[in-house]
Amino acid sequence: MRSWARPVRWSLPMFARYGPGGHYGVHTDNAVVHDENGWPVRTDISFTLFLSDAATYDGGALLVRDPAGDREFRPEAGSAVLYPTGQLHGVTPVTRGERLVCVGWIQSLVRRADQRELLFDLERVRSGMDGGEAALLMDMAIGNLLRMWGED
């Protein structure tokens, strides 16, 4: 998660409980929230940490709209889903049981999602290299891109 999100600041977490009929319509989150000291946090990445075991409720999927189509998530308790905050998302109606989640937002060192994804891909390639000149050049490229794209 750290190499994909590159967090520099976190919002305060929020907790949500959805019972039967509970849902949250498709929306986009605020561009800025505040941390525990009242300082603004640019919301580059949203996260949902699932606290209820998926077997204890029906419905209540996290719906994320993606250019490739809608994706629904109902992972096991303790799992988190991260996605770019600007993507439309919502929660489908709960039909049985209770859905408990923790949600929050991350300000990334790298503002743009496409740049974060490119860096993540390069680091995955780098992790498969044994070393040598090619690995050094890849490390240099990743570092230079971070200096070029990184913000505080």
Question: Predicted segment positions?
Answer:
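Fe(II)/2-oxoglutarate oxygenase catalytic core
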Residues: M1-S46, L51-A80, G86, T92-D152
